[in-house]
Amino acid sequence: MTQITLLTPDDWHLHFRDGDMLKETVPATARLFQRAIVMPNLLPPVTDAKMVIEYRERILAARPEGSDFEPLMTLFLTNDTTEQDIIDAKAAGVVAAKLYPAGATTNSDAAVKALDALFPIFEKMAEVGMLLLVHGEVTESHIDIFDREALFIERNLRRIVDAFPTLKVVFEHITTKEAADFVMSASDNVAATITPQHLLLNRNDLLVGGVRPHNFCLPVLKRNIHQEALRAAIATGSSKFFLGTDSAPHEKHRKESACGCAGCYSAWSALELYAQVFDDLGIIDKLEGFASIHGPDFYGLPRNTSTVTLVKEKWTVPSEIILPNGNPIVPFFAGEEVSWKVKS
């Protein structure tokens, strides 16, 4: 197959950041994706309805002229979140709330330290129809970074899912066989997003031949048996798995430093890279489900009606992009050849 037409896809997990960065990140996503779930881990985090409304307005203001791209907003859960916060956020159009264990990722220091205290919040979310999005890692310093996702499932996620069977839960950016197996065996109210980097790469691509900071993300890349498990999961065509890039921009100097930031900025190449993976696996016919159907169906939103066409044509991801402030950012797969391209 040398050409494929899909219903316009959505990105069910990304980071736009804020300020001038929005002038880069919003158009990058809006070029191909109709909707995106926008992460709330700003400084300060987006913890109430007023902050959500204001952030959404800033995103809309950064859309390209004529764009009808729709940001889907989320609330940042803390141990100070109240049931009224959930009610107000739902009224403001929030579709999901995000559970970050404190310290798990960029700007998550204010996040959840006492999970059980949030159980009344989860109950209210189930009642009003708000999804729970989970960054599934434990964060105690003595626990090996490669084991944190699997431990989170056993310590926390299984308890949440069992306690709130009507709560829809998205296990975001899964990276392990344990996560894929958990999602497959859980109820229909549990699903997962998978990033392009976790399908394309494993920890060798981060550490062999030198540290490669632009492949560094959280959750960190795992060994190849886990990469293969994720690839096997999408090959099933299961509606439990769908596209979430976790596109996470950081300026070049913040990645290429003695203590570099975590995140892969994949918005400019994500759909094409997913197509490459699906094609390599001989399942290109399953790409539309993963990219365009499973996500809206799980969220209870209408599928898009417009389409996008990809052709099998090689192109090279730019080595860097200049941000509105004049600083460079290195996109994911920079300088690499990609075998699928969006038909202009």
UniProtKB/Swiss-Prot annotation:
Binding site for substrate: 15-17, 41, 135, 218, 250, 262
UniProt pathway annotation: Pyrimidine metabolism; UMP biosynthesis via de novo pathway; (S)-dihydroorotate from bicarbonate: step 3/3
Known catalytic reactions: (S)-dihydroorotate + H2O = N-carbamoyl-L-aspartate + H(+)
One term of GO molecular function: zinc ion binding
Catalytic residues (positions): 246
Cell division as UniProt keyword: no
GO biological process: 'de novo' pyrimidine nucleobase biosynthetic process; 'de novo' UMP biosynthetic process
Enzyme class: hydrolase
UniProt key word Secreted: no
Pfam families given in the database record: Amidohydro_1 (PF01979)
Cofactor binding summary note: Binds 2 Zn(2+) ions per subunit.
EC number: 3.5.2.3
Keywords: Hydrolase, Metal-binding, Pyrimidine biosynthesis, Zinc
Cited InterPro entries: Amidohydro-rel, DHOdimr, Dihydroorotase_CS, Metal_Hydrolase
Residues where N6-carboxylysine is found: 98
Cofactor: Zn(2+)
Gene Ontology annotations for the cellular component aspect, listed alphabetically: cytosol
Annotated Zn(2+) 1 binding sites: 13, 15, 98, 246
Role summary: Catalyzes the reversible cyclization of carbamoyl aspartate to dihydroorotate.
Subunit text: Homodimer.
Similarity field: Belongs to the metallo-dependent hydrolases superfamily. DHOase family. Class II DHOase subfamily.
Protein name: Dihydroorotase
Organism of this sequence: Shewanella sediminis (strain HAW-EB3)
Source species taxonomy: Bacteria, Pseudomonadati, Pseudomonadota, Gammaproteobacteria, Alteromonadales
Gene name per UniProt: pyrC
